[in-house]
Design a protein with these regions (language model features):
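Hydrophobic alpha-helical membrane-insertion signals
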Residues: 1-33
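Anion-binding and metal-coordination hotspots
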Residues: 3, 8-9, 68, 75-88, ...
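Basic, short loop/linker segments at the boundary and entry of helix-turn-helix/winged-helix-like folds
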Residues: 27-69
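Short alpha-helix boundary/capping elements
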Residues: 42-43, 72-75, 90
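Secretory-pathway/luminal and periplasmic proteins that interact with or process carbohydrate-rich
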Residues: 92-97
Length: 555
């Protein structure tokens, strides 16, 4: 070993005469600084009502919010991992100001603010609007299925519950007949006219118990056997009443759905895209709907139904409640194209670039329309009749109403040909046994489809269709692949919504940081975080001063 070799001085236990700032080692352009400036500028006065004046002083909600959001930005969703990082990571130590809440405190804070965190998300989006990152004029809609925390074998099917409930009611009727034979005639229950509910069964079992208690003591062997039989029927009736109450509770929890999970009744069993066994197995989950703009999440909602068609109206209906108005333009795929949704957009004054189910098929280069399809037949609007390929007139015979799963009633006109027997094109026209072909046409839906086709094939429509592929799909890709948010970690819809709201806020802040660090044409950073933070804080300070002046003027 060389004698003149010198190492740098190393003393991990050395003490400093003057304490240094902990953020001296945090870069000025780090996302943690923009997160801190954004949260400090938000109005968290709504959190004050969630705390009590008495007792030990709680941790400041701004500190807790910053720590949780920074964890979500870095793919850390476990409260126990956050607790460890508060001891080890300099970024977390700086955000918390050397405070170290444990995992239970962090989890309690999330549950405490679950009704207020949605307002914070709205404030953040409005700040993005003020800064020009989003406009809320257009919404790119799409949905994805997120698996619930519940186990995949905790399923409860509606048909099974209804079938077992009918079998149980039949057992109860037979048991009540046996009880009537054992009880006095004046206390016997009329099984045929009696409404079998858990409450009535409880009353019957109570009367039966009183009758057993007032009976004389059994002495002989036959009397004791009869007494044991009565006690057995009494216990069996109680078990049937409890089981009937359980079945009724399951049906109430379903709320029109076909399945629920035992441990997470808000979740519905759906077929997920991630199917490892490739057998189409259903898993408990939620249908997550988002609206994005410039790859920022502007709105979201969770639904129990797996199809996107029924989520369109309630999802867009929540937009005015959050921002006070509808978006002027909506872009969505063919999963949302239905008469009910088109009519809603027409009445709300929304320009809808929404595809219908046959849009892609009709616009393929090699597409050849079916000559015998009702859409290809000639329609005389004045006479309200169709002409078949053989030139025969198809007159209108009536109107048929159909009800969708959401309760919407659509009307279809029926048209029937007069002479189809002996037609040389009959084998190509239709396959029914009847000698007269009948077609159903929804004129209102066809009008909406023509309007949607004109919008989608216009120059603006082609542009919007191209942007839709990189808007919500990019958000889902970042969420599932890069941020590892593929499954919910809570049970119950209220907690699941709370968890995703935290994620949506963290996602938007992370996207904001990414946009601020974009490289310009010369290869240099367009602006540093320091300049943006100063401008942002000054803007929010002036906004607070204006609000104070306005409150004094109106007081």
């Amino acid at each position: 070993m060389p004698e003149n070799l010198h190492f740098r001085s190393y003393d991990p236990d050395q003490t400093l005469l003057f304490p240094q700032r902990i953020d001296r080692d945090i870069p000025k352009d780090d996302p943690v600084r923009i997160l801190k400036s954004v949260i400090e500028s938000l109005d968290l006065s709504g959190f004050k009502k969630l705390y009590h004046e008495r007792g030990r002083s709680p941790y400041h909600p701004k500190m807790m919010l910053m720590v949780i959001l920074y964890s979500y930005m870095n793919n850390v969703y476990s409260c126990r991992k956050i607790e460890k990082l508060l001891y080890r990571d300099i970024y977390y130590i700086w955000l918390s100001g050397y405070q170290k809440p444990d995992f239970a405190t962090i989890n309690r804070f999330r549950n405490r603010v679950k009704n207020e965190i949605g307002h914070i998300f709205t404030l953040l989006v409005l700040i993005l609007v003020e800064k020009g990152f989003v406009t809320l004029e257009v919404g790119y809609l799409d949905g994805t299925k997120i698996e619930s925390k519940a186990n995949k074998y905790t399923f409860v099917w509606r048909k099974s519950v209804e079938r077992n409930c009918e079998k149980l009611l039949e057992k109860i009727r037979v048991l009540l007949q046996q009880i009537n034979e054992q009880m006095a005639q004046d206390k016997a229950a009329d099984v045929d006219t009696l409404e079998l509910t858990p409450q009535t069964l409880c009353e019957i079992s109570k009367e039966f118990k009183e009758a057993l208690g007032s009976a004389p003591e059994a002495k002989t062997k036959e009397e004791k056997a009869a007494q044991r039989g009565k006690n057995k029927m009494f216990k069996e009736l109680e078990r049937h009443g409890e089981k009937l109450a359980e079945y009724n509770s399951r049906l109430e929890q379903m709320e029109g759905r076909n399945s629920i999970s035992k441990t997470d009744p808000s979740a519905t069993f759906m077929r997920m895209k991630e199917d490892a066994m490739c057998n189409g197995q259903t898993k408990p989950g939620y249908n997550l709907q988002i609206s994005s703009e410039n790859q920022f999440i502007t709105d979201f909602a969770l639904f129990p139904n797996p199809t996107d068609t029924l989520t369109f109206i309630p999802f867009l209906g929540s937009f005015p409640g959050r921002y006070g108005r509808f978006p002027k333009r909506v872009v969505a795929d063919s999963g949302y194209g239905s008469e009910e949704n088109y009519r809603f957009m027409d009445e709300a004054g929304i320009e809808g670039f929404v595809k219908y189910n046959r849009f892609h098929l009709e616009h393929r280069p090699r597409y050849k329309p079916d000559t015998f399809h009702p859409d290809s037949l000639y329609y005389n609007e004045e006479g309200d009749y169709y002409i078949c390929p053989m030139g025969q007139r198809m007159s209108r015979t009536g109107t048929v109403q159909t009800r969708t799963e959401g309760g919407y009633i659509s009307q279809s006109a029926c048209y029937r040909a007069i002479r189809c027997k002996g037609c040389p094109l009959r084998c190509l026209c239709y396959k029914a046994k009847a000698n007269q072909r009948t077609i159903r046409v929804n004129h209102r839906l066809n009008a909406y489809k023509r309007k949607a086709c004109e919008l989608l094939t216009s120059e603006e429509g082609i542009k919007e269709r191209g942007r839709r592929c990189i808007e919500p799909e990019a958000v889902f890709g970042q969420m599932k692949s890069n941020m590892a948010y593929r499954r919910f970690r809570h049970m119950g819809k209220d907690k699941v919504v709370m968890d995703f709201t935290f994620f949506a806020i963290a996602f938007n802040i992370k996207k904001l940081c990414s946009m601020m660090r974009k490289v310009d044409k010369k290869g240099r950073k367009t602006s540093s975080y320091g300049k943006f933070v100063v401008i942002f804080i000054c803007y929010m300070h002036k906004l607070e001063i204006c609000q104070d002046k306005f409150e004094k003027m109106t007081a």
